[in-house]
Amino acid sequence: ARGDVAARLTAAGIDTRAAVIYRQTLLDLTEEARALLSDRRPVIVPLYSPRTAARLAEVATPRAPLHLVAMSNAVTRAAAALHAENRVIADSPDAPAMIRAVLATVRRVEGM
């Protein structure tokens, strides 16, 4: 698991056991997503995890101008291979901050 918390706690002298509580299955891009990324119109892409950002960078070959909105610096680093018009990092790693960042990006893109 990311961060290997159980191993770090055990190394600090706290007896722990690891358990996977949530596992996200990576999916391929839908045809609709591929079509949007192939267009020349701007696409705002909210990215919530480094894993998803890396996967998008791996499978996408966008022609569209991308405007990436990332939940954290780690997410932005994972998307480094994607060419983007701009990259925004949310003020904090939570849903309200992501919503604010996406809305600010929408306003900026629409003003272009």
Protein language model annotation of sequence segments:
Residues 1-112:
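Conserved beta-alpha
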